[in-house]
Regions:
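Hydrophobic residues at beta-strand termini and immediately following loops
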Residues: 6, 103, 127, 190, ...
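Active-site-proximal beta-strand elements of phosphoester/diester hydrolases
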Residues: 1-10, 14, 90, 132-141, ...
Length: 220
């Protein structure tokens, strides 16, 4: 499976410009099977503003993902804030034919106040695509190894989409290797870049093999 990891900055309060920027980054990328975007890739990780959430029935960002998947004939995944009987940090996996599955983030980042506005998910989600089984995970889930336990070899790749700050990036790097090694699975991890107030994000997106070795990656 060929995967494009898209590490990008987010234009404050402009979903349209942010999505256009992603399209520009992908313009020079040849055909791949899967495009992976960061956590809340269209709006940024905003745990105080409920207005960033779109209807679960079908908002503009999910429709954009479906259009991108169809145009590129690739699956597209990343997380979006949605309103579904309460706000959810929803990690979508969208197929080229427009069908999709999703995972709602289970471990909300309480230290940042995510739990005040968002409701946690319950069940993990494994998607099989082109013969590869992918476990959908979101940011803070990385710190909870039991939640990604590869019992009976139920998945081949764990995909983490994140907004992980620079101040804790050494933990990100180490935990990605740990999750790969302990589960004997590949890890695909995509983090954003940029600055929001006092928070800096410097990427470190990467693909890690089941021995904990970095196959490919981006620094910042």
């Amino acid at each position: 499976m060929e995967i494009a990891i898209v590490q990008h900055d987010i234009v404050a309060e402009s979903v349209e410009r942010t999505l256009s920027g992603i399209e520009s980054l992908l313009a020079g990328v040849e055909a791949v099977d899967l495009v992976v975007l960061p956590e809340m890739f269209a709006t940024g990780f905003d745990v105080d503003d409920a207005s960033v959430a779109e209807p679960a029935s079908g908002g503009g960002v999910r429709r954009w993902m479906q259009s991108l998947a169809a145009a590129r004939r690739s699956a597209v995944e990343g997380s979006v804030a949605v309103d579904d009987n309460g706000l959810r940090n929803r990690h979508y996996f969208v197929c080229p034919d427009g069908t999709y599955r999703y995972y709602d983030k289970r471990h909300l980042f309480s230290f940042g106040g995510e739990n005040r506005l968002y409701r946690q998910g319950v069940s993990p989600c494994v998607v099989e695509y082109k013969g590869v089984r992918l476990l959908l995970q979101t940011c803070y889930d990385l710190r909870f190894p039991v939640f990604s336990r590869n019992c009976g070899g139920c998945y081949d790749v764990a995909v983490y989409v994140a907004s992980w700050p620079k101040s804790r990036i050494s933990a990100w790097d180490t935990l990605l290797q740990a999750r790969a090694i302990e589960n004997l699975a590949y890890v695909v991890a995509v983090n954003r870049v940029g600055t929001v107030g006092k928070l800096e994000y410097d990427g470190h997106s990467r693909v890690v093999d089941y021995l904990g070795r970095t196959v490919t990656g981006v620094a910042d």
